[in-house]
């Protein structure tokens, strides 16, 4: 492709509303153009990247035994009403009516459509298992679309759905898809982690998320550098401390804390570690108050708390409810002296082994020090893991300690079980001729989101640094003075034709532009290999080669390559 025949639309500055690096660079490089809130046109350069990602995804899905189809983007309301999600999905679903006033939605996902297809077409256990996938445009009416295509309203997604006669069969396909996802992200040249995740609203028994590691990621991941363990912080287990509770060494006493309403302030006033303080969080489970105790340096994990019996729909108590029970404002609350006949006390594992700790006195402007379970207050009603892990915690797999990093979710796999098949009566006849609900799996990849995540992970001060497998072109030939020098034109055309003949994706920059502009565009767009041809170099019989991503030992200096050896040299580096 020649730039004079291509649509290259680069800019020096990104719009002020662009926040993430990927959003700024994708706009500046001309990969995308904004149409409206959360709506983007994929420009020719960006579409080339998107199609390369799509090709890798398609190859690995086919390799894993999935069968491609394409379902309608617009879906009838009746299917969603069968599962109850027409009302549950909320305002993210774009609902529309046709000329006959029949209701439809622009599909945010396709569980209902594929389950309807399965119940129509699958009759016998002999037809199972089956695994279908599509690469399809989705629409979710985000309340605040942002970050470019990272969180757009319209996006491209690969979604796959598998159907099974047994949970064992589902588990086998789940593992095959898990492995396929690993191959996809490895082939795309991305640093990623597969993490155990919460099944959330989709439901099911097992779930893993795939995260591209980037400082800008919205999700916090706990992982062990010494093993394969990784989990979303929502699910990462905080093990019980190895040490048992120590014997009391202090008498309980009141300490005046006139302006100190947080554990941090109290610890600073008393000159003690924050880990020696205990904070109380009051929550409501229906009409009953439940008290949650955490170490002062730990944070409540609401996902874990909601999994405790009776707390699935808990909410934080408001100030009026707190004052009605404690006769004390928030900031001075503690577990000593509360009515245990009406208030349930749940303590985190780390709190349960504490002695001589500091907590609120249930008295304005006072805290208690030297507090001990068994002596000054009853043992908790329940001890459970209800906190977020922190860096340095023991890894749940026993193979080291945890570290934390941020990630961008680009893939998610679920074992759905029979949630949708039961709701929609998707059954098959087993060997005994009895109708059984199919077991289902669901496997999604954000194809367009991968592009943005890759930019977040692969950029420098000059622009994008594409992994080779995602780059819109493999080689850019910068022909300085192409329209003015016959020798430059002939050499550039020859190298361009030679590379094209062997299947190399090459961009020939034959514009009448200043060299600085051509170099800046090549670096901004992020093409992995650049060859520069100029009259002076050709007079010496050389061209200049510059990799976009130089290996540390090579440095960033350009190399001079003999004109006659340019093709062979490039084929060598492209094969590395």
Curated annotation (Swiss-Prot):
One of its GO terms (biological process) is prolyl-tRNA aminoacylation. It catalyses: tRNA(Pro) + L-proline + ATP = L-prolyl-tRNA(Pro) + AMP + diphosphate. CDD domains: ProRS-INS, ProRS_anticodon_short, ProRS_core_prok. GO terms for molecular function: aminoacyl-tRNA deacylase activity; ATP binding; proline-tRNA ligase activity. Transmembrane segments: none annotated. Keywords: Aminoacyl-tRNA synthetase, ATP-binding, Cytoplasm, Ligase, Nucleotide-binding, Protein biosynthesis. The keyword Iron does not apply. InterPro entries: aa-tRNA-synt_IIb (IPR002314), aa-tRNA-synth_II (IPR006195), aa-tRNA-synth_II/BPL/LPL (IPR045864), Anticodon-bd (IPR004154), Anticodon-bd_dom_sf (IPR036621), Pro-tRNA-ligase_IIa (IPR002316), Pro-tRNA-synth_IIa_bac-type (IPR004500), Pro-tRNA-Synthase_IIa_type1 (IPR023717). The keyword ATP-binding applies. It is found in: Cytoplasm. It comes from the Bacteria. Its EC number is 6.1.1.15. One of its GO terms (cellular component) is cytosol. It holds the Pfam family HGTP_anticodon. Consists of three domains: the N-terminal catalytic domain, the editing domain and the C-terminal anticodon-binding domain. Homodimer. HAMAP family: Pro_tRNA_synth_type1. Belongs to the class-II aminoacyl-tRNA synthetase family. ProS type 1 subfamily. Catalyzes the attachment of proline to tRNA(Pro) in a two-step reaction: proline is first activated by ATP to form Pro-AMP and then transferred to the acceptor end of tRNA(Pro). As ProRS can inadvertently accommodate and process non-cognate amino acids such as alanine and cysteine, to avoid such errors it has two additional distinct editing activities against alanine. One activity is designated as 'pretransfer' editing and involves the tRNA(Pro)-independent hydrolysis of activated Ala-AMP. This is Proline--tRNA ligase.
